[in-house]
Amino acid sequence: MAGAWLRWGLLLWAGLLASSAHGRLRRITYVVHPGPGLAAGALPLSGPPRSRTFNVALNARYSRSSAAAGAPSRASPGVPSERTRRTSKPGGAALQGLRPPPPPPPEPARPAVPGGQLHPNPGGHPAAAPFTKQGRQVVRSKVPQETQSGGGSRLQVHQKQQLQGVNVCGGRCCHGWSKAPGSQRCTKPSCVPPCQNGGMCLRPQLCVCKPGTKGKACETIAAQDTSSPVFGGQSPGAASSWGPPEQAAKHTSSKKADTLPRVSPVAQMTLTLKPKPSVGLPQQIHSQVTPLSSQSVVIHHGQTQEYVLKPKYFPAQKGISGEQSTEGSFPLRYVQDQVAAPFQLSNHTGRIKVVFTPSICKVTCTKGSCQNSCEKGNTTTLISENGHAADTLTATNFRVVICHLPCMNGGQCSSRDKCQCPPNFTGKLCQIPVHGASVPKLYQHSQQPGKALGTHVIHSTHTLPLTVTSQQGVKVKFPPNIVNIHVKHPPEASVQIHQVSRIDGPTGQKTKEAQPGQSQVSYQGLPVQKTQTIHSTYSHQQVIPHVYPVAAKTQLGRCFQETIGSQCGKALPGLSKQEDCCGTVGTSWGFNKCQKCPKKPSYHGYNQMMECLPGYKRVNNTFCQDINECQLQGVCPNGECLNTMGSYRCTCKIGFGPDPTFSSCVPDPPVISEEKGPCYRLVSSGRQCMHPLSVHLTKQLCCCSVGKAWGPHCEKCPLPGTAAFKEICPGGMGYTVSGVHRRRPIHHHVGKGPVFVKPKNTQPVAKSTHPPPLPAKEEPVEALTFSREHGPGVAEPEVATAPPEKEIPSLDQEKTKLEPGQPQLSPGISTIHLHPQFPVVIEKTSPPVPVEVAPEASTSSASQVIAPTQVTEINECTVNPDICGAGHCINLPVRYTCICYEGYRFSEQQRKCVDIDECTQVQHLCSQGRCENTEGSFLCICPAGFMASEEGTNCIDVDECLRPDVCGEGHCVNTVGAFRCEYCDSGYRMTQRGRCEDIDECLNPSTCPDEQCVNSPGSYQCVPCTEGFRGWNGQCLDVDECLEPNVCANGDCSNLEGSYMCSCHKGYTRTPDHKHCRDIDECQQGNLCVNGQCKNTEGSFRCTCGQGYQLSAAKDQCEDIDECQHRHLCAHGQCRNTEGSFQCVCDQGYRASGLGDHCEDINECLEDKSVCQRGDCINTAGSYDCTCPDGFQLDDNKTCQDINECEHPGLCGPQGECLNTEGSFHCVCQQGFSISADGRTCEDIDECVNNTVCDSHGFCDNTAGSFRCLCYQGFQAPQDGQGCVDVNECELLSGVCGEAFCENVEGSFLCVCADENQEYSPMTGQCRSRTSTDLDVDVDQPKEEKKECYYNLNDASLCDNVLAPNVTKQECCCTSGVGWGDNCEIFPCPVLGTAEFTEMCPKGKGFVPAGESSSEAGGENYKDADECLLFGQEICKNGFCLNTRPGYECYCKQGTYYDPVKLQCFDMDECQDPSSCIDGQCVNTEGSYNCFCTHPMVLDASEKRCIRPAESNEQIEETDVYQDLCWEHLSDEYVCSRPLVGKQTTYTECCCLYGEAWGMQCALCPLKDSDDYAQLCNIPVTGRRQPYGRDALVDFSEQYTPEADPYFIQDRFLNSFEELQAEECGILNGCENGRCVRVQEGYTCDCFDGYHLDTAKMTCVDVNECDELNNRMSLCKNAKCINTDGSYKCLCLPGYVPSDKPNYCTPLNTALNLEKDSDLE
């Protein structure tokens, strides 16, 4: 904030530089030209300059340090120095530069003049020459006012010389631009009305305002407090001005200053407080001015003459947040006899206390989702060491520097009085630019602060006001006293500044005590709009650049106000820049596609980050400027927009009010239908409404809560965030509009912030506009309210914040607990409660109303202690909380008192808070308007031409000139309550209606005598006539070309406007320019002379026809000749004419001749060999006849077809198949059968008659159609089933002999060791020496191997039956294992009771060796094997294992049993026991079963028998289906709940469609993933039906099932027939292995795949695929087919192993070779 007005005050500040003389008094008069030019010699920017002359009288005490700091160069004594430099330009002169005077030579001491002078020159046109008088130089300069067009004369309307460059339209400067002086380029913008108050015209109709001013033309000075300042004995309405004491009376009585334009002069001065002034002060001022802090003051002379800090620009340094508002002002009051210490601009500022809290925030990312976590540290208080040293406070890992200097242009304050400047700036405040400078080494080093401190740190800057603690502990702000807090801290930490206050004065005395003999004046901050005690969190300190995604800043795009997901909506109608859109109302921006706006746009500064607050945009690296949102089209629909600082205001039209987002005006009130309808909680992808609520609701109640669709037509609810959603849910999700809430029909104001003008009928609420970027842990904040007397009976509240654990010890406090996110109290802001439906924050600044404090609430009363003997009164505040009405009740020892809200006062008669009539009690309220009192507030009713001020306390004039085109092309002059239009620009004239109208210069014929005159707004242009016209008196007349000879030969000429056209004769066509006729080549058209030849002629053509054609009557076509008119053509047929010829269509049996002119008979017997096959053909006239032999018959096509004798039933018998042959048949008998003697049947062959069929290794067993060989042990039947072959155990059992060589023998095998001195041990599978015993073990023998232990080797999936993966062979075989090995290479364990078992397990089953090996010396150390520990859950699955000695026990749950082979607890099927459910339907469940009885039978007491109740006499039909309640939910304790309402179902319907239990007995339904559920609900297991065939072969493995297609089970009510369960089906046993369906004829069974229907028994029986299909096709290749229930499986033959093909086994040798080949590859 300080940096902005210091830029404007540099020229004044330069004049205050000290010289080496001591005690000199110098008076210097400067002519100050307000403008943005800073450096000496800079040219002033465009705009209407208004000069002011200030006289500054300084009493400076020079010192050596100050003289050496920055004294300018000295001049020779007596030689006057040049102060100004004038340059001539059209229209007047302008001040180009201002140079500070050199210091004069030393002179004798002169009497000092007290104070300083600063006042504007009332003359307005000063003109004086420099003069020197007694060491006092006065420079006066006259700066005439420039014209609005830049000082030049008015531009000529018609310029002969064409301008070049940009902004040129039609040979002249575009509208809004003019020529720059001394050039022919249109580069000077024009602002109409001109920029006022020293503003700069940046581009047409865009003014860059000076600090402290605002508006479209900078015509409005920053808003000030309407309350009058108190100057000693002055009345509240008296005016005063800033100046030295002796000039105060003059300024008060002078009226010339009021006639001057409202320009805010900017000056920087140091007011020195003298102990004993030599000149007496006027009586109006009894106190002296206390010196300000090191920050300079921007003084705005407003109408109330109040001194306010009102920045338009503010320093955009990193870390600035909190409640400081650019809209806020700091009014100052002169208060007498206040106890405060004087503060001066020096290093003697006393001790300063800084209270801050460090926080450490980290980002944790898990699986692509990141979240912030912040941990707050302890609150730390630091106090500076002394007033002379730099204010550098140091804590652990933190370095805090307090700086009073406003370092500019990215400079950093390293100590109290030193700025470390960037490389391109210099000076004490880094205010002087340096051109072409290189980066010094010191600055290069400063860019890496981490290296200087030894660790990486972050530099943060916080600009905060300096407060002083008074006697009562109230924090008093000194608005001019603003300090910069520089904090260097680790990068992962952030700093929260709580308090920056002064402890004692410059001499060490405490601020609570006043020094005797001093009359002091203190500055006290009044409660102003949007200002409160600083309590902000500064986080996100890392310098991370945030840039816009579009590189070109001038690129225009569309601004979107809503962004939902990846969709952008609510676009403004016009185009805007990204920085204007994203800095104000936009959430996304783009042209072809939208891009989300960054959360906080940032730009790099020097060693810090510059961030602009919302509503502002960057001007340069150190300053941010307000964005005029009203320049964005459509920002205030249905309303008028007014720009404010950092925001804007919308005045809604009558009948409109603000929407919940405060971004537009919507019809007021919204029409919400009260119609009720069904509310649906879910909408499926097919747009079907589901899950309706039980009651009907309105659309608002439905869509604003849980509904997704509403109404009888399933209307989808609008998405949250859309305009349709806001219309029916203005309060957002979860809130509805009640009937009592209706907006008042007044003008509403909509904006980005709380800027509405409404009554103040509730407590003040503070609004935070800058939340911390990183989420922090929210903690409760205690709001402590204090009171400090400002005068008799006047108290002013202040709000301070402190941590919950640190309370301020005061007895007259009222402490209120505020949770995070709740509105906090702040003085000077009047709001209404935040209703969920209308979250509108209304603000207005009203005149200060005294807050009455009851005398009972003082400290003395509050500290009274009630004695134990006293009787306390009833607490009225507790009994009746609303006893005070609009106020807060405070109980007292006697009765109670009320602290009333703003706008109310306490009435002693009514004992409650009553409304204050501000209209009668407050003077000068609602000036220029009418005041209307309201409950708790008031309203200002403004007449036409006026509007309510931002504070809502006065009616201010509406500047109609700010509206575009209000005067057309003229100049608008605003008046009080109205406006008028003055002179017009060149090319325009004033109408009687007061508007500027364009002059049509083209009405004068002499304007363009030989050219065409084109009128344009404000100008005209002479344009040469185009071809076909000639110029005459400013018009272009047509030339008649048809009068010229040889025009349009072979055609007629028609004159046109500016041209002519030819109408050509027949046979000719116009050329493309329509000015000539040329011949048409008709032969190129393609549709002439068809079937002939076309020849083009001049203007026509000629046709020559071919054979069979003749010329048409029009002679343009060749017509066909109809030859069929001759009757003798085409005998035995019909004549058909064709193009150019004819065709004979002959009758059947005839064909056309070679020439096609007659019909001939066809001899079918010679030409068609396919006729009369297997017979004799006889040709006839036009046809033929066939004669067939025996065994054939003639068909309709006259072909001899074979007679199929196999169609006769019983032919070839059941063991044969009839095969039809040509003219006969043949019986094909099945294998094992032969044809009978007559050849019509098949007889069985007895293969066992031949004794050599099964040789000597088995015996023969004859079967029907075949035989089988029953082989002895060690032999097996081959694939063809004939004979018995030896089983090669060495190939079948891999590794059966271990390390020995396996030798196959007839019927058995031998294990032979390679060494003759060794013998094979079947126990260990190893070859051992014959001299050693099994117990002798070599010392070097390795430890016994550990492999996998297997169980249940008879299972097809035996490789998966692993008990334990790492056990010895004895641990496996001596316990529960049956096989031992690795990777399914299994060594079978010896059988219990054999010698091999005794050798391996000498102690018996259940005992294993105690050592690491089974061959310890002695072999006697054995222990009991803990099978439960050794095998874990595998030995007792689904049960509890208990080890015993020897062995173990497996305890299963009730209803289950233990399978010792599969080592698992399985469900016990109680339904196998007929006594479990007699005369009922038994349904097995996991661990239990259910017994269901058919209606009307019920269960008896034992629940195992269905009996008929004695009282029932109903006749029961077999087809009745029993229905009962269906329970939708079953708890973990098996308690049924939530019965299906309105419907009774069968057991199947309940379990398959609706619930989890059924019936009054709460019969449990099977689990959804169980086989019982699939069987109950008829869910196919295999998925789809498949036909038999080679492609339908399933895998040999039992676990293999073909991949099932996805299937969808429809709801029961959509099925064409109902699927019924056993108790509902009319068929016995309920179609087991199939589904029972109800058809019109009754019931039938739909069998599953693998079963077929036996119609005799009406049951589904298994299909034996191995018998019925294996004869037709080989189901198993090199494998044996084994039938299973509903399917079959293939088991590989010995010597074969499974392959990757289904049902195919490959030889073992081939498989091994393939594995070797794959290993080699």
UniProtKB/Swiss-Prot annotation:
Kindly list every residue the record annotates as glycosylated: 347, 378, 424, 620, 647, 769, 801, 937, 1019, 1059, 1141, 1197, 1224, 1250, 1366, 1488, 1687
**Source organism:** Homo sapiens (Human)
Where does it reside? Secreted; Secreted, Extracellular space, Extracellular matrix
- General function of this protein: Key regulator of transforming growth factor beta (TGFB1, TGFB2 and TGFB3) that controls TGF-beta activation by maintaining it in a latent state during storage in extracellular space. Associates specifically via disulfide bonds with the Latency-associated peptide (LAP), which is the regulatory chain of TGF-beta, and regulates integrin-dependent activation of TGF-beta. Outcompeted by LRRC32/GARP for binding to LAP regulatory chain of TGF-beta.
Which residues does this entry mark as bearing (3R)-3-hydroxyasparagine? Answer: 974, 1137
Keyword GTP-binding in annotation: no
Q: Where is the composition biased (Pro residues)?
A: 99-111
Q: Which residues carry this modification: Phosphoserine?
A: 1414, 1597, 1616
Name all EGF-like domain ranges.
Answer: 187-219, 399-431, 626-663, 873-910, 915-956, 957-997, 998-1037, 1038-1078, 1079-1119, 1120-1160, 1161-1201, 1202-1243, 1244-1281, 1286-1328, 1424-1466, 1467-1503, 1621-1657, 1662-1706
Any idea where the TB domain is? Answer: 557-609, 677-729, 1347-1401, 1524-1577
PTM notes:
Contains hydroxylated asparagine residues.
Supply the name of the protein.
Latent-transforming growth factor beta-binding protein 1
Pfam family example for this protein? cEGF
Of which family is this protein a member?
Belongs to the LTBP family.
As annotated, the protein's associated disorder is:
Cutis laxa, autosomal recessive, 2E: A form of cutis laxa, a disorder characterized by an excessive congenital skin wrinkling, a large fontanelle with delayed closure, a typical facial appearance with downslanting palpebral fissures, and a general connective tissue weakness. ARCL2E patients present with cutis laxa, inguinal hernia, craniofacial dysmorphology, variable heart defects, and prominent skeletal features including craniosynostosis, short stature, brachydactyly, and syndactyly.
Q: Which parts of the sequence are annotated with region: Disordered?
A: 64-158, 228-259, 750-811
Q: What are its GO biological-process terms?
A: establishment of protein localization to extracellular region; sequestering of TGFbeta in extracellular matrix
Q: Where is this region: C-terminal domain?
A: 1507-1721
Instruction: Give the signal peptide as a residue range, or say none if absent.
Output: 1-23
Q: List the GO terms this entry assigns under cellular component, sorted alphabetically.
A: collagen-containing extracellular matrix; endoplasmic reticulum lumen; extracellular matrix; extracellular region; microfibril; protein-containing complex
